[in-house]
Amino acid sequence: MSPPAAVSPTTRSVELAAPAVKLPVGLSKNNTTATIEEMEGKWDDFKFAPIRESQVSRAMTRRYFQDLDNYAESDIVIIGAGSCGLSAAYILGKKRPDLRIAIIEASVSPGGGAWLGGQLFSAMVMRKPADAFLREVGVPYEDEGNYVVVKHAALFTSTIMSKVLQLPNIKLFNATCVEDLITRPSEEGVRISGVVTNWTLVSMHHDDQSCMDPNTINAPLVISTTGHDGPMGAFSVKRLVSMQRIEKLGGMRGLDMNVAEDAIVKGTREIVPGLIVGGMELSEVDGANRMGPTFGAMALSGLKAAEEALKIFDIRKKQNAF
């Protein structure tokens, strides 16, 4: 005899009155943030929305590793997030939203030397016509005739950085350094086809730790704007010498603002196939003068680097298929 079939009891929905809950100041009923005006004067009752520590960990980790995956194959890699690199990124990201652009910056704080003017002073001086770029990104300045003055260099750097980071096709990997260049054989000898990366803190300890291999990013085009010679500066061009792609560096000459800025902007170019060099790193290749605390050439060298990149990108992309 078969067991009796189970019969579900008749159910009817019952609406239960939700107990009244006193919402903390700062949250509305649908968990949206209150306005500042609603919070003012009510700090004794203030409370943040609840969170579990693992939620924070997963929110950061998931997004960062997704970025690593997305940008493992980039269209353009920019080494160095100083004024030149950020200016190049801004133009590229704006003109070509279809390109995937990775910026690699060794420091925790991007911006290079553009947070202050000369001798740790605040004001930033740019010679005309670099004021055109300030107007483009919305940085106010005082007009002094042949040059303009931004009241604090950090105003320029924070503004251009905010513009760049809001572009959906650009990812900044800071606290990350480039340890080497990826190369491919080509008719011209060697073509640059990406970068070798590592955490900066790891790179600083290769002498006292072992087995700390790097990561890689493939890209048909690299723009190097790492600054003049230093611990991380002029990295790419120094590596070209050790790879025997260029014979030697010209070495940066003494300070001459009038000569230096024109030379840097005019000289910004593809040094070897797949590698464009701009900013003060270029002075180490060409033996150009240093310019000191005037920043117009850094911004406009970035603009020219972006322009040069767009001229040759399609060619380098075809070459980089394998």
Swiss-Prot record:
Localization (cell): Cytoplasm; Nucleus
Modification note: During the catalytic reaction, a sulfide is transferred from Cys-211 to a reaction intermediate, generating a dehydroalanine residue.
InterPro entries in the record: FAD/NAD-bd_sf, Sti35, Thi4_fam
UniProt cofactor(s): Fe cation
Catalytic function, reaction form: [ADP-thiazole synthase]-L-cysteine + glycine + NAD(+) = [ADP-thiazole synthase]-dehydroalanine + ADP-5-ethyl-4-methylthiazole-2-carboxylate + nicotinamide + 3 H2O + 2 H(+)
UniProt subunit comment: Homooctamer.
Protein role: Involved in biosynthesis of the thiamine precursor thiazole. Catalyzes the conversion of NAD and glycine to adenosine diphosphate 5-(2-hydroxyethyl)-4-methylthiazole-2-carboxylic acid (ADT), an adenylated thiazole intermediate. The reaction includes an iron-dependent sulfide transfer from a conserved cysteine residue of the protein to a thiazole intermediate. The enzyme can only undergo a single turnover, which suggests it is a suicide enzyme. May have additional roles in adaptation to various stress conditions and in DNA damage tolerance.
Entry protein name: Thiamine thiazole synthase
Species of the source: Fusarium vanettenii (strain ATCC MYA-4622 / CBS 123669 / FGSC 9596 / NRRL 45880 / 77-13-4) (Fusarium solani subsp. pisi)
